Regions:
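Bacterial N-terminal signal peptides that target proteins for export
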Residues: 1-9
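C-terminal motif of bacterial Sec signal peptides marking the signal peptidase cleavage site
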Residues: 18-21
Length: 390
């Protein structure tokens, strides 16, 4: 979900009313397999990927889709049919999804819990209660979850956030570390956990720091001053962290920065590189931006690839066949590390079902498929998904 729910400010009250009234007429698609790629069945250690659809806030429409590389079949809404006794399905607003060991973890932001599943079957294991939880990171025996801590609302006195430490064996929260306001994505380098703090609920008094947590003591050892309203954070292969700032949606634009983790200082600021979401494949950082301006009352969409070895912007558009003109609201991106294929999701108007587009390494579209509502977060799996039990 975009920080502090910008999309709810950008979408008109009429559209939000339509979202509520259309819930019965346009539900999230039921479990339904569709052959989308009959021409190419891929073998290898990556069997498929899960796509977490956020779902419109307040509707409990978060859902889980799955693509099988061996069969070329995309299946929508697999969680409900595999967990028929979970009353609210996945819950309200899926915000992150990761695989660690034999478990699939999904952050369900507005339901205030992390859903833990068996990655082989997608069967529910437990829910871990964390208020206004946001993103996941893992190392050793522990999972780490960033949390806004307070209610979902813009407020000048919004609570300071924290990172929860979860024992991956007992699936219990064992510790908490206070960080900045409205913490977002996290990255681990060595024995340090870096947390991007946004302060998005405290507009215009945004946070502008990255918290550095010593994982041995699980205490915040310092804050790195970067820029206002931070969101994404991505490590490269050279000891650097790429950090995105959303700006203030008025005069201060979205930007991308590099932190050198050997000094824990900002080492580089890109000129004209807005950044909403990014993902790394080898030395190529794929990113896109959907930048809102309250001055123009309009969105500006852009794409880019950065060479993380040279810090050069290699291209300003990695989609080469014009498909980007069909993508209304890019909302998620992932790159298959084996094949170089990349995936881009389209949330459209946040009300209708979204679309997933698959592109070859050459930037030419291979296939597209309808998804759940607000398709956002993708994780590749090296575990073969077991068929549904009869």
């Amino acid at each position: 979900m975009k920080g502090f729910y910008l999309k709810w400010l950008a979408v008109s009250i009429g559209v939000l009313t339509l979202a509520a009234s259309c819930r019965k007429d346009d539900p999230v698609l039921p479990s339904e397999p569709t052959l989308v790629n009959p021409w190419e069945q891929v073998t290898g250690d990556i069997y498929g990927f899960f796509l977490l659809n956020e779902g419109n806030m307040g509707t409990n429409q978060a859902s889980l889709d799955y693509y099988d590389y061996e069969t070329g079949v995309y299946t929508r809404n697999i969680y409900g049919e595999r967990n028929p006794y979970e009353v609210k399905d996945l819950g309200d607003v899926g915000n992150d999804i990761q695989i660690y060991g034999d478990k699939l973890w999904a952050v369900i932001n507005c339901s205030n819990y992390v859903e833990v599943m068996d990655v082989n079957t997608v069967k529910h294991i437990t829910k871990i209660a964390i208020p206004n939880c946001r993103y996941l990171a893992f190392k050793g025996k522990y999972a780490y979850v960033s949390a806004y801590a307070g209610p979902v609302q813009i407020a000048p006195d919004a609570r300071i956030g924290y990172v929860a430490k979860i024992d991956t064996a007992s699936l219990q929260v064992v510790d908490e570390c206070i960080v900045g306001y409205q913490p977002e994505e996290m990255a681990i380098v060595g024995d340090k956990l870096y947390v991007a703090n946004s302060g998005g609920y405290r507009v215009p008094n945004y946070d502008r720091t990255v918290s550095v947590i010593d994982l041995k003591t699980f205490t915040e050892e310092k804050k790195i001053d970067v820029a206002i309203n931070l969101h994404r954070i991505q490590p490269d292969n050279y000891g650097n962290l790429y950090v995105s700032s959303r700006g203030d949606y008025y005069e201060i634009p979205s930007k991308t920065f590099i932190i050198d983790t050997s000094t824990d200082e900002v080492a580089y600021e890109f000129e004209d590189l807005p950044n909403t979401h990014m993902t790394l494949c080898r030395d190529s950082l794929f990113l896109y931006s959907t930048e809102w301006s309250y001055i123009t009352n309009d969105w500006t969409v852009s794409y880019a690839i950065v060479n993380t070895r040279t810090r050069e912007i290699v291209t300003r558009n990695f989609i080469k066949d014009g498909t980007e003109k069909r993508i209304q609201t890019p909302y998620g991106i992932a790159v298959n590390p084996n094949t170089g294929e990349f995936l881009v999701t389209d949330a459209k108007d946040y009300v209708r079902a979204g679309t997933l587009h698959c592109f070859g390494p050459d930037g030419i579209r291979k296939w597209s498929i309808s998804t759940g509502n607000i398709p956002a977060h993708i994780v590749f799996t090296r575990k073969k998904l077991q068929p549904l039990e009869e």
